Amino acid sequence: MYEYINGLITNIYPAYLVIADRSGVGYKLFVANPYRFEQNVESHVYVEQIVRENEMTLYGFIDENEKYLFNKLLNVSGIGPKSALAILASDDAAGLVTAVANDDASYLTQFPGVGKKTAQQIVLDLKGKLDDLALSAGMTVETVPTTDNQALADALAALESLGYSAKDVAKLQTVLANQKDTTDGYIRSALKFLVK
């Protein structure tokens, strides 16, 4: 197993790059976007080795967070290394983390090779598992919008604790924001709206 490779990036191709270590061995690393790396520059590339029946493949990453996200994506049913790299190539890790946190499967369908079922599976499998990535990378996850109306804020928090998705709660906030009511009144109005 390799954790990372320090070396000179000797070649860059559309799907992979070649990095030569100090002993002169060149490693072919499949990467999400090879053009983020510079040719003929000493680099520190994080690596994940995947062994299949008849092949051993190395995948390279620009930082530890990208590698972490790659491994989390591999744990999703229906996502293989190539699909995970295609998702990472969008360079929108924050968008991915936010979409998972907000149960927004429709956002995930914009990634190559991700259909509706796979997007729903990503949300299901990764929900709550990317929070540590968001914190370590300094990402801000956009969840339920905040409000100055304390009664509305309490009602929205109560609805979320009842199991309603952050996306539904955010919609409710826009619907209920123009009303003046108690926390109980907001919850009743929200439940009526949700049952429609």
Curated annotation (Swiss-Prot):
<keyword id="KW-0233">DNA recombination</keyword>
<protein>
    <recommendedName>
        <fullName>Holliday junction branch migration complex subunit RuvA</fullName>
    </recommendedName>
</protein>
<dbReference type="InterPro" id="IPR011114">
    <property type="entry name" value="RuvA_C"/>
</dbReference>
<dbReference type="GO" id="GO:0009379">
    <property type="term" value="C:Holliday junction helicase complex"/>
</dbReference>
<dbReference type="Pfam" id="PF07499">
    <property type="entry name" value="RuvA_C"/>
</dbReference>
<dbReference type="InterPro" id="IPR012340">
    <property type="entry name" value="NA-bd_OB-fold"/>
</dbReference>
<dbReference type="GO" id="GO:0005524">
    <property type="term" value="F:ATP binding"/>
</dbReference>
<dbReference type="InterPro" id="IPR003583">
    <property type="entry name" value="Hlx-hairpin-Hlx_DNA-bd_motif"/>
</dbReference>
<dbReference type="GO" id="GO:0006310">
    <property type="term" value="P:DNA recombination"/>
</dbReference>
<comment type="function">
    <text>The RuvA-RuvB-RuvC complex processes Holliday junction (HJ) DNA during genetic recombination and DNA repair, while the RuvA-RuvB complex plays an important role in the rescue of blocked DNA replication forks via replication fork reversal (RFR). RuvA specifically binds to HJ cruciform DNA, conferring on it an open structure. The RuvB hexamer acts as an ATP-dependent pump, pulling dsDNA into and through the RuvAB complex. HJ branch migration allows RuvC to scan DNA until it finds its consensus sequence, where it cleaves and resolves the cruciform DNA.</text>
</comment>
<feature type="region of interest" description="Domain III">
    <location>
        <begin position="147"/>
        <end position="196"/>
    </location>
</feature>
<comment type="subunit">
    <text>Homotetramer. Forms an RuvA(8)-RuvB(12)-Holliday junction (HJ) complex. HJ DNA is sandwiched between 2 RuvA tetramers; dsDNA enters through RuvA and exits via RuvB. An RuvB hexamer assembles on each DNA strand where it exits the tetramer. Each RuvB hexamer is contacted by two RuvA subunits (via domain III) on 2 adjacent RuvB subunits; this complex drives branch migration. In the full resolvosome a probable DNA-RuvA(4)-RuvB(12)-RuvC(2) complex forms which resolves the HJ.</text>
</comment>
<feature type="region of interest" description="Domain II">
    <location>
        <begin position="63"/>
        <end position="141"/>
    </location>
</feature>
<dbReference type="Pfam" id="PF14520">
    <property type="entry name" value="HHH_5"/>
</dbReference>
<dbReference type="GO" id="GO:0005737">
    <property type="term" value="C:cytoplasm"/>
</dbReference>
<feature type="region of interest" description="Domain I">
    <location>
        <begin position="1"/>
        <end position="62"/>
    </location>
</feature>
<dbReference type="InterPro" id="IPR010994">
    <property type="entry name" value="RuvA_2-like"/>
</dbReference>
<keyword id="KW-0234">DNA repair</keyword>
<dbReference type="GO" id="GO:0000400">
    <property type="term" value="F:four-way junction DNA binding"/>
</dbReference>
<keyword id="KW-0963">Cytoplasm</keyword>
<dbReference type="GO" id="GO:0048476">
    <property type="term" value="C:Holliday junction resolvase complex"/>
</dbReference>
<dbReference type="InterPro" id="IPR036267">
    <property type="entry name" value="RuvA_C_sf"/>
</dbReference>
<keyword id="KW-0238">DNA-binding</keyword>
<dbReference type="Pfam" id="PF01330">
    <property type="entry name" value="RuvA_N"/>
</dbReference>
<dbReference type="GO" id="GO:0006281">
    <property type="term" value="P:DNA repair"/>
</dbReference>
<feature type="region of interest" description="Flexible linker">
    <location>
        <begin position="142"/>
        <end position="146"/>
    </location>
</feature>
<dbReference type="InterPro" id="IPR000085">
    <property type="entry name" value="RuvA"/>
</dbReference>
<dbReference type="GO" id="GO:0009378">
    <property type="term" value="F:four-way junction helicase activity"/>
</dbReference>
<keyword id="KW-0227">DNA damage</keyword>
<dbReference type="InterPro" id="IPR013849">
    <property type="entry name" value="DNA_helicase_Holl-junc_RuvA_I"/>
</dbReference>
<comment type="similarity">
    <text>Belongs to the RuvA family.</text>
</comment>
